[in-house]
From Swiss-Prot:
PROSITE patterns, sorted: DEP, RGS
Example GO biological process: response to amphetamine
A single GO cellular-component term on record: glutamatergic synapse
Known partners and oligomeric status: Heterodimer with GNB5. Interacts with RGS7BP, leading to regulate the subcellular location of the heterodimer formed with GNB5. Component of the RGS9-1-Gbeta5 complex composed of RGS9 (RGS9-1), Gbeta5 (GNB5) and RGS9BP. Interacts with PDE6G and GNAT1.
Region Disordered, residue ranges: 524-571, 637-662
Name of the protein described by the UniProt record: Regulator of G-protein signaling 9
Keyword Membrane tagged: yes
Basic and acidic residues composition bias: residue spans: 552-562, 646-662
Length: 675
C-alpha cells in the first residue's frame, strides 16, 4: 500500500510526521532494522513482535543520541500510532523493558488522507459492543449513545456493518484476529482519545487554501511583485561583514545585562524566593541600580524605554526649557496604544496643546511635517501623528541626548546608583546562580571518546613480571589469609593445605592493606634480593624502614640457636617454580596477608578488626609456611609480619618442622638464573 500524504498540505504543523515515517521505515528494514520474532501473548502466537528495549536501543544507535532523548522520541512514535503495545493497549508509551510492541499498518497512519469520521467510529463501537456483549468503557458508552443520537438516520447501516465485520473477523485465525483488534484499538485511541489523555492530533482548523498550490499569475499580482522589487532596490545595502560586526558588538554590549547568560543581581527571585530584585528594579524606584543607569548610555531607545530614565530625562529637559518635546512624544505613544474609542478625543487634545498656533506647549517642527499632520487630523487614527513624533524623536536623540549624558544630572544619578551584592539561598538545590552556561558535549563526541578509551585499554598489555607494576598499596583491597602446616615426608600434600569450604567473611570486616614501607610486597623483596648485594641471612629492608627488624621480633628457638654455616649470597628469585611444586604446596590456597597488624592463623579464616565479630581463640605458637613468606612463626603478642629469608640449607636438616622457603609463582626460571 502506498503512503498518501496529501492531507499534510493543509496541516503545516504536522509536517514532522513524514520524518517519523522515514524513521519507522528504517526500523522495519529486515537487515538493519529492529529485531522481530514471534511472541506468545495469552493463548495466541503473534508474529513480528518486538520488545521496547530493542526499539530504544535501535533508536539510540541509529541516531547517536542519549537514552533520555531516545525515550522521548520513542514515546512520540507510540503516541502518534506508528507503534502500538500488545500487552497494555491503553498505555501509549514506550517501556524500556521486555514489553511487546508491533508496527502499525500504513493504512492506519495519521498522514492518510481519509479522516476519522463518526460513522467509522460508530461501527467500531458497535462491533465492540457485540463482541463484549455490552461491556464497554464508560467513555465508550457515552460516545456510543451520543453517536446513536447524532447519526440515528443511518444507525441500521452501522449495525449491519458491525455485524458483517464481526462475522468476517471470526473466520480469521487467532493471530490475525488478535493483531487486527490491536491495530483498530490503537488507531481509535490516537484519533478518539479517552478523557484525561492528551490528543496529539489536535492541530486546529484546516486551512481554507492550499499553501502549496501554484497560483495563476494575474496583472495585479505581477504589479505588486514589480513594486516590491523596486522598493528592495532602493534600500541601502550593507556588507555582511559590517552587519556581523554590529551583531557581535551588540552582543558584547548587552551580555552583562542578560539575566540568562550572566545572571541577575542580587539573586533570581524565581529561584531564591527573594523579591529584592523586583524592589530594586521597580519602574519609578527612588534610587535605581548602577547596571540600570549604565544601560541608559547604550543608546537613546534604552533611555526613553525606561520609565525612570524618562523621568530623569524630563527633569533635564525642563532645565533646558524643552520639556514639551518629551511630553509630545509620550502623548503620541498614548494615542497609538490607547483605547480606540478615545482616539478622536485624544488627537484633538494633542493638537490644541502642542500643534495649534499659540498653544501652551507648542513644539517646533518644520512646516512640511506640520502640514502633513494637520491634514491627517481631519480623519484621526492611531498613527496620524507618526510624522511629527518621528521628527521630535530624532531631535531629542541627536541634540538633547548627548548633552544629557554629559550633564551633572546623569552623573549624579550614576554616582548614587546602587550596586547590589550577589546573594544566594543556601537551601536552594538549583545550580543556576550567576554562572556561565556551557553547552553539553555532543553524544557523538562522547561515544567516540569512550570507544577510543576502550581501544587504548585493550592495547595496553599488562606484564606483572616488570618491576614497579602492581606494587603500589591498594588501601581498599583485603587479601585472604590462610595457613598451611608443612607436609610430612609420608604425605607430601597435607590435608590442611586444602581450600577452606566456608565462604569468605564480609568485605566490610577485612583489614585494609598497610603501607608498603612497613611490609613490602614479596615481588619487591624478590627483586631487591636479585641484585646480589645482600646476603640471604640478612633482612635488607629492615634497616631502611622505621619498623622493627625481623630478627628483633623473632622469638628464639632451638633451631636458630645452633650456629649454621653462612651460604654465599644467593638471589631470592633463583628458586624455580619446579622446586616450589616439589615441596608439596601445589594445592595450597594460602595467600599472603601483607599486614603487620593481622597475623596468619592456623584455622584459615579472616581475622576481624578489633571487637568486630566473634573473637577467635588464641592458639599456641605454631610454625607455618605461608604462600609468600619464606620463614614464618605464629607470634602470640606481636603482630608484625615476618618477611625474611634464612639460610636455604636449614630446610635440609633432619627437623621436619622447619619451614621451607617458596618463591612467587609468576617468577620464571630464566629470571632466577639471571639473579
Amino acid at each position: 500500500m502506498t503512503i498518501r500524504h496529501q492531507g499534510q498540505q493543509y496541516r503545516p504543523r504536522m509536517a514532522f510526521l513524514q520524518k517519523i515515517e522515514a524513521l519507522v521505515k528504517d526500523m522495519q528494514n529486515p537487515e538493519t532494522g529492529v529485531r522481530m520474532h514471534n511472541q506468545r501473548v495469552l493463548v495466541t502466537s503473534v508474529p513480528h513482535a518486538m520488545t521496547g528495549g530493542d526499539v530504544l536501543q535501535w533508536i539510540t544507535q541509529r541516531l547517536w543520541i542519549s537514552n533520555l532523548e531516545a525515550q522521548n522520541l520513542g514515546n512520540f512514535i507510540v503516541k502518534y500510532g506508528y507503534i502500538y503495545p500488545l500487552q497494555d493497549p491503553k498505555n501509549l508509551i514506550l517501556k524500556p523493558d521486555s514489553s511487546l510492541y508491533r508496527f502499525q499498518t500504513p493504512y492506519f497512519w495519521p498522514t492518510q488522507q481519509w479522516p476519522a469520521e463518526d460513522t467509522d467510529y460508530a461501527i467500531y463501537l458497535a462491533k465492540r459492543n457485540i463482541k463484549k456483549k455490552g461491556i464497554l468503557e464508560e467513555y465508550e458508552k457515552e460516545n456510543y449513545d451520543f453517536l446513536n443520537k447524532k447519526i440515528n438516520y443511518k444507525w441500521d447501516f452501522v449495525i449491519m456493518q458491525a455485524k458483517e465485520q464481526y462475522r468476517t473477523g471470526k473466520e480469521r485465525n487467532k493471530a490475525d484476529r488478535y493483531a487486527l483488534d490491536c491495530q483498530e484499538k490503537a488507531y481509535w485511541l490516537v484519533h478518539r482519545s479517552p478523557p484525561g489523555m492528551n490528543n496529539v492530533l489536535d492541530y486546529g482548523l484546516d486551512r481554507v487554501t492550499n499553501p502549496n498550490e501554484v497560483k495563476k499569475q494575474t496583472v495585479t499580482a505581477v504589479r505588486k511583485e514589480i513594486m516590491y522589487y523596486q522598493q528592495a532596490l532602493m534600500r541601502s545595502t550593507v556588507k555582511s561583514s559590517v552587519s556581523l560586526g554590529g551583531i557581535v558588538k551588540y552582543s558584547e554590549q548587552f551580555s552583562s545585562n542578560d539575566a540568562i547568560m550572566s545572571g541577575c543581581l542580587p539573586s533570581n527571585p524565581w529561584i531564591t524566593d527573594d523579591t529584592q530584585f523586583w524592589d530594586l528594579n521597580a519602574k519609578l524606584v527612588e534610587i535605581p541600580t548602577k547596571m540600570r543607569v549604565e544601560r541608559w548610555a547604550f543608546n537613546f531607545s534604552e533611555l526613553i524605554r525606561d520609565p525612570k530614565g524618562r523621568q530623569s530625562f524630563q527633569y533635564f529637559l525642563k532645565k533646558e526649557f524643552s520639556g514639551e518635546n518629551l511630553g509630545f512624544w509620550e502623548a503620541c505613544e498614548d494615542l497609538k496604544y490607547g483605547d480606540q474609542s478615545k482616539v478622536k478625543e485624544k488627537a484633538e487634545e494633542i493638537y490644541k496643546l502642542f500643534l495649534a498656533p499659540g498653544a501652551r506647549r507648542w513644539i517646533n517642527i518644520d512646516g512640511k511635517t506640520m502640514d502633513i499632520t494637520v491634514k491627517g487630523l481631519r480623519h484621526p487614527h492611531r498613527y496620524v501623528l507618526d510624522a511629527a513624533q518621528t521628527h521630535i524623536y530624532m531631535l531629542m536623540k541627536k541634540d538633547s541626548y548627548a548633552r544629557y549624558l554629559k550633564s551633572p544630572i546623569y552623573k549624579e544619578m550614576l554616582a548614587k546608583a546602587i550596586e547590589p551584592q550577589e546573594t544566594t539561598k543556601r537551601s536552594s538545590t538549583l545550580p543556576f546562580m550567576r554562572r556561565h552556561l556551557r553547552s553539553s558535549p555532543s553524544p557523538v563526541i562522547l561515544r567516540q571518546l569512550e570507544e577510543e578509551e576502550k581501544a587504548r585499554e585493550a592495547a595496553n598489555t599488562v606484564d606483572i613480571t616488570q618491576p614497579g607494576q602492581h606494587l603500589a598499596p591498594s588501601p581498599h583491597l583485603a587479601v585472604y589469609t590462610g595457613t598451611c602446616v608443612p607436609p610430612s615426608p609420608s604425605s607430601p600434600f597435607s590435608p590442611s593445605c586444602r581450600s577452606p569450604r566456608k565462604p569468605f567473611a564480609s568485605p566490610s570486616r577485612f583489614i585494609r592493606r598497610p603501607s608498603i614501607a612497613i611490609c613490602p610486597s614479596p615481588s619487591r623483596v624478590a627483586l631487591e634480593g636479585s641484585s646480589g648485594l645482600e646476603p640471604k641471612g640478612e633482612a635488607s629492608w629492615s634497616g631502611a624502614n622505621s619498623g622493627p627488624s625481623v630478627t628483633e621480633n623473632r622469638e628464639p628457638s632451638a633451631d636458630h640457636s645452633r650456629p649454621q654455616p653462612r651460604a654465599p649470597p644467593k638471589a631470592r628469585a633463583a628458586l624455580s617454580l619446579g622446586r616450589f611444586l616439589r615441596r608439596g604446596c601445589l594445592a595450597s590456597p594460602v595467600f599472603a596477608r601483607l599486614s603487620p597488624k593481622c597475623p596468619s592463623v592456623s584455622h584459615g579464616k579472616v581475622q576481624p578488626l578489633g571487637d568486630m565479630g566473634q573473637q577467635l581463640p588464641r592458639l599456641k605458637p605454631k610454625k607455618v609456611a605461608n604462600f609468600f613468606q619464606i620463614k614464618m612463626e605464629m607470634p602470640t603478642d606481636s603482630g608484625t609480619c615476618l618477611m625474611d629469608s634464612d639460610d636455604p640449607r636449614a630446610g635440609e636438616s633432619g627437623d621436619q618442622t622447619t619451614e621451607k622457603e617458596v618463591i612467587c609463582p609468576w617468577e620464571s626460571l630464566a629470571e632466577g638464573k639471571a639473579g
